[in-house]
Amino acid sequence: MDGKRKIEHTADGTHYDATSNVKRKPIFPPFIADSLSEATEKANVMGGGMNSRLQILSEMSKRVQATAPISSLEHFKQLSDISPSFTSSANSINQPYNYSGSLENLVPTPSAGTPSQFMDAQNPYGAVYNALSQFSETEPKMPSYMDDEEASDSLPLSLSSQSLSSQVTNQKPAPHRLTMRERYAANNLTNGLQFTLPLSSRKTYEPEADDDSNDDMYSDDDSNADRWASRIDTAALKEEVLKYMNRCSTQDLADMTGCTLAEAEFMVAKRPFPDLESALVVKQPRPVIPKGRRGRREKTPLGPRLVGICMEIMRGYFVVDALIRQCEQLGGKIQRGIEAWGLSNTATSDEGETSLVNFDQMKSFGTPANSSFITTPPASFSPDIKLQDYQIIGINWLYLLYELKLAGILADEMGLGKTCQTIAFFSLLMDKNINGPHLVIAPASTMENWLREFAKFCPKLKIELYYGSQVEREEIRERINSNKDSYNVMLTTYRLAATSKADRLFLRNQKFNVCVYDEGHYLKNRASERYRHLMSIPADFRVLLTGTPLQNNLKELISLLAFILPHVFDYGLKSLDVIFTMKKSPESDFERALLSEQRVSRAKMMMAPFVLRRKKSQVLDALPKKTRIIEFCEFSEEERRRYDDFASKQSVNSLLDENVMKTNLDTNANLAKKKSTAGFVLVQLRKLADHPMLFRIHYKDDILRQMAKAIMNEPQYKKANELYIFEDMQYMSDIELHNLCCKFPSINSFQLKDEPWMDATKVRKLKKLLTNAVENGDRVVLFSQFTQVLDILQLVMKSLNLKFLRFDGSTQVDFRQDLIDQFYADESINVFLLSTKAGGFGINLACANMVILYDVSFNPFDDLQAEDRAHRVGQKKEVTVYKFVVKDTIEEHIQRLANAKIALDATLSGNAETVEAEDDDD
């Protein structure tokens, strides 16, 4: 030997150590083994052994940071901060490896996606309460039968392919085999290893190797937060915490720290505290928690735990107050600019937004002193289009922020012409010889509408549509790189701008002057890949367009502000997260945590200078009335039995409260498992409320065996395995199996008879509404979040002999506007079926005057967006919105959370009383 350790690797993941003449079992996936081999070579050069090898690999590991498929060792080297968990598709599609800090701990563990872990037999609710609290802050991951054309995340393959057939029909679960989908995935491992990085561990947004140097200005670095923290007076901080501990109520202490009311009462009973040390020594007697073989361990004592949390939050408030002062300074510049126009800015920090409506406000100020203020549309804007006062003011507001080198959120309510104002702003820049290049990023469903609006409002602008196949985009890149002055505005989608590396690099190299992000709430998650990639596109000026700046919570609102003004917010993001992340105790309700007065007041002060929001009630006197009605549906006896059997015949609230108590005692690993189970249970409960055909009830196993045998006669199944086909069918729902029977002649005879799709509580309610709508000459837009529900509703429309159109995420972008035009032109089409995600944004369906929301959303603003597809400029009739909610089901709880989020939005806007009145009407 030459002194070097020689290690050889085999295809099955084992490796042979030539030095010790030992063939070792595959404790590492092959990819990591390759990395070890490379580390070994480096260690030999350094003269070290195994410790050096582990040290080198550890350093390599720290460079992995993105949640992305790892396709090669070279790709691995380019990344940073290795994930605590990842999946080796090379060994087994269902064998995750858990990395807990050292390579010796890198061992296979059972898959989190196997059927045995989907359901807790003793408590099928699992950790539903924890999931509800989690989903109330952010939307749940999209299940496979849910529609979202822009969604990049989904539930695991094995989870999404499961059905509740065995639970609903009391069938014995079949032994788990790889389904056809899983076998296909196993044979097409082109993406390599899938790394999943917990959001909390993402610390630095390092640019990729080909990123622009400008990316550094968008980093979210711990050192930035430390710079703010270093300015805090520690003595003053401790004094504030001591005051709070001595003055706060029991409920306030529980809300701030997330402790139980009993713990808060115990702490309050020990007051007064002469100093913090007196609070730190408080220790509440608590039961000892068993920890299996590791013995028994107690939690952190009560005093240190509560004082520590209060210190962290109060430190966050100190940093946030410094941010507020900076925002107020910038807001002062904006205010002086508005006053120079001769306008009175009606925005205050208490209202949380700017509201400039019309020129009547100029009367007390006289004529504009600022020559840049315009009172008529820009010269290059189409002369045939008349702009309202509030729209011209919006153009001026955008240009003012542009001149001040700031950024803004144009948050007018849906239907008030944000697209029109944006195009007019581009026209104004053209008049001032600022010709671009500019960029507009929008959902795919709005692409054609943007093109039409550009042609309608400003045909002089040269528009470049960056969209199409990979080959087509390559041609566009070559053409533009050879002539960068060939366009003024580039138009593309969120998916293209944030997915392909070639597309991202191309967009970064364009050096855009203005970047506009339509439906800006797509950027609400600062930890997402989409957010990070779009943040890396440099621009001189950023504008977000959104009718709903607040989607779920204040943390998401801060993410939007951090996106448009990174130089303002990047130093305090960690402190902002502390303040605006809700801590919810088991006894405190969600609404109280969401509407925390201190959090809301600070959010208002930060957002006020940068958000322009006008409401329909302020600017559109002639817009017809919109009436919302919640239609409560009653289960039939059979539907109720199925639902209660699955829900263990217990109250949702009692189960949820019980589980959140249990969750507090969980380890991180158990907590992750509970969240996965809870997400699955939530989806199934929603499906049970929607329609029984979302499960396998009618197609028994004996029928499936006959179908599996018959379908072997189809050309594409000639060489398939009949047993595998049968097993795959076992995991399909009734509607999937029925559609399969309609597709293949060999199994046509197995189609469902007697129209079982009409037998559901929501369908019975829908039938009555549609019958009355047809008699009254009303036209209906019918929304559902789930594509399989739309499949069922298509069958319902046919049974009712109603003409309809359908639009969902799978509809080709080129045909979407044609469907809308067809609905406008043909009044005999009674119903337009739309998925809430794909059809809820940027679409004008003012020719309809009835909106039906078949299922409720965790995010109420998705529903509001859907409503305003019909209730917008151009509507001639009063609009009625019906929302279906099944009594005594999970939907009532989702609706309650939605009401709390709407109340938070109203509080930020100063309209809480109005919302309360509307809720009472409902």
Swiss-Prot record:
Q: Which PROSITE patterns match?
A: HELICASE_ATP_BIND_1, HELICASE_CTER
Bias regions of kind Low complexity — which residues?
153-166
Q: Which InterPro entries does the record associate with it?
A: Helicase_ATP-bd (IPR014001), Helicase_C-like (IPR001650), P-loop_NTPase (IPR027417), SNF2-like_sf (IPR038718), SNF2/RAD54-like_C (IPR049730), SNF2_N (IPR000330)
| Residue positions binding ATP | D412, E413, M414, G415, L416, G417, K418, T419
What GO cellular-component annotations does this UniProt entry give?
chromatin; heterochromatin; nucleus
PTM-bearing positions, type Phosphoserine: S213, S219, S617
- Location of the motif DEGH box: 518-521
Keyword NAD assigned to the entry: answer is: no
User: What's the domain of life for this entry?
Assistant: Eukaryota
**First and last residue of the signal peptide:** none
List localization entries: Nucleus; Chromosome
Region feature Disordered, mapped onto this chain: 139-177, 198-224
Domain Helicase C-terminal stretches? 765-922
User: What keywords would UniProt list here?
Assistant: ATP-binding, Chromatin regulator, Chromosome, DNA-binding, Helicase, Hydrolase, Nucleotide-binding, Nucleus, Phosphoprotein
Which GO terms are recorded in the biological process aspect for this UniProt protein? attachment of telomeric heterochromatin to nuclear envelope; chromatin remodeling; DNA double-strand break processing; DNA repair-dependent chromatin remodeling; positive regulation of transcription by RNA polymerase II; replication fork processing; transcription elongation-coupled chromatin remodeling
Reaction(s) catalysed by this chain's protein: ATP + H2O = ADP + phosphate + H(+)
**Classification via Gene3D superfamilies:** P-loop containing nucleotide triphosphate hydrolases, Tandem AAA-ATPase domain
Q: Which GO terms describe its molecular function?
A: ATP binding; ATP hydrolysis activity; ATP-dependent H3-H4 histone complex chaperone activity; chromatin binding; damaged DNA binding; DNA binding; helicase activity; histone chaperone activity
Q: Where is the Helicase ATP-binding domain?
A: 399-567
Query: Which residue ranges have biased composition labelled Acidic residues?
Result: 207-223
Task: State whether it acts alone or in a complex, and with which partners, per the record.
Answer: interacts with the GDP-bound form of spi1.
State its role: DNA helicase that possesses intrinsic ATP-dependent nucleosome-remodeling activity and is required for heterochromatin organization. Required for maintaining a heterochromatin chromatin structure at centromeres and subtelomeres by protecting these regions from euchromatin assembly. Enhances the nucleotide exchange activity of the pim1 guanine nucleotide exchange factor and abolishes histone-H3-mediated RanGAP inhibition. Involved in the construction of the centromeres.
Q: Which family does the entry's similarity section mention?
A: Belongs to the SNF2/RAD54 helicase family.
Q: Under which name does UniProt file this protein?
A: ATP-dependent helicase fft3
Q: Which gene encodes it?
A: fft3
